[in-house]
Amino acid sequence: MDERYTQYIENLRRVRALARPEAHAGMKAADLLEEIKQNAAESYTLMQQSNAILDEVIFSRRAENLTEEEAAGLSEFAGKLFNYANSEDCGIAYKIHALLLDYARLKQDDRAIIRELYWAGVTMHYMNVRSDDSSINPLGKQVRGYFQEGASYMARYEGFDLETKSYIIRCLGNSRMAMSRHSHADCEAYMEVFDKAMGVIRSPYYRKLDPSIPWDQFEYAMHADRMTLLAYLRDFKDPEIAEKVLESAEYIHREQAKNQMDDERLQNWRLGYFYAMARYHAGRCPVREVVDVLLEAIEKADPKDYSPTGINNNLTSLSSLFYYEAALPPEETPQYACRLEKMFSKSVSYLNDLPVNQYPRVASNAVRELVEMQAGAERPYRKNMLVYMLAAHKPTYVHSLMVANLTRFFVRRLLWKKPEAMVGTMGYDTVEAVRQHAEELCVMAYECGVYHDVGKSMMTMYVGNNSRRLLDEEFVCVQWHAAFGYELLCKIGHKGDLALAALYHHTYYDGQGGYPKDQPPCPKNMKPIVDALTVADSLDAATDNIGRCYTAAKPLEKLIEELRAQKGSRYAPAVVELFDDPDFCTEFRRKLYESRQSVYLEVYRETI
């Protein structure tokens, strides 16, 4: 393999290792901060090197100029970056397969087109970030497009070799990927695609024509995927869909012994408790039975198993436990309290100890499910969400605490110097009212800062990617963290305050830019706090000179100039004008740098 490809993979692994400084008990504060700084500096250097490699070997290449040898080398490289057992870099694997698809189209090579349609669809699917029911699904349409085009070759199925036929069948089955499971109508649409694929997979004609194709495994995988409709059933009682899910669960329960293979797609690690869940939603057993099965599975999990199956057994299983435990009748809850607390502590320790390896996608999905299930449970799990953010990605937690401190600092100064700018916040409609409730407003400002980026816990594989610049497709996904945060915080009862801060913190003051797009204006009851948070967010992100490694920190003076240049458009005039006071600037500078050191030490020492 080209040595540049090997170097890129080595850089990936080194940057992941640098993300976790070698801290230890008794380590001096200055030494720990220096360790974090040095790691960030090395990561930045490696990122620049990796970007240069990618520019040379992928981004500068065009399909019309590729040779067969180069195409073969790129295909091998893509296989090293992504397969079902690991996920070194799904995004670059996708870019390679997209390039190879263009190459195959130019050559009019149908076999290669079908193969690359499959792999482009799969790698983009694993790049995508989705809510549990796929109601948020930014790349879903593109994913389905690849598979639907691949499935369209069924019309010429008999004319292809066995390998290509297998890809066509996989594309047909995968056409249901990325479909929403948010409503009964969504589930019916999913079932229509499911039934069409199963009609081919079960067909005596095709099985007789090509007996060596693993039809039974394909059927098993289809049933395993239909279990994803449990996400819909956790929100809605729907006997019709519940019976369909139970049908698949019973099939899997019967056939599981035949399908114990090293294939992450089959999710064998959780099919045991899927059966209990399906029976519960179909009214065949009490929720207590599901909780018992989950607890038994988690207690058996090896806390030192850091393989994909180990990650899922230790973390993803717990996410389901959060939901079903919350559905227990009140009189049954106390008997589980001690075991649940032990499981929670075990999962946090597991995340802290999880070595940086080639499974960032698996770990990211596990954290996503943990956070999402906690938010969906009818219990106040808000603090737990922060624990998972801390354990999963410490820089995000550092940033959140910094933004919380700075937002409160801005709001406190506005209440003192420009209280009229805070009128309307939290329903306090006069200057006198906002002054009387100043402490309450400051507490809310701090809380909004703490939780503004909670949506990033749904996409830690991107947030923690310091090995190269984000692809356009990945940036589209990252932009959805605001909407994810909004959904999560709405689910735990903060639709009117914290959720609004999460949703609007990247929206411009005048509503003419930023993201998410096409949102109504931020409600007046939270707008002044969101305005302060937006400035705090920009200032912390751009001035971090300790752990920030994807670009160099900017001088505060330059940033203040940028704030002033965008006053009234991106940033609120009332907040920007605070910097017109030299004394405020001096105090802010001290607050910024003292707080940053304190917060870094607090977060990184928690896991020593």
Give each language-model segment a name:
Residues I36-E56, N83-D102, D132-A155, H182-R207, ...:
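Helix-turn-helix repeat elements of alpha-solenoid scaffolds
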Residues D161-T164, D210-D216, V423-G449, L489-V535, ...:
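Histidine/acidic-rich helix-loop-helix segments that form or flank divalent-metal centers
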Residues K346-Q479:
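Acidic/His-rich, divalent-metal-binding segments that scaffold phosphate/diphosphate chemistry
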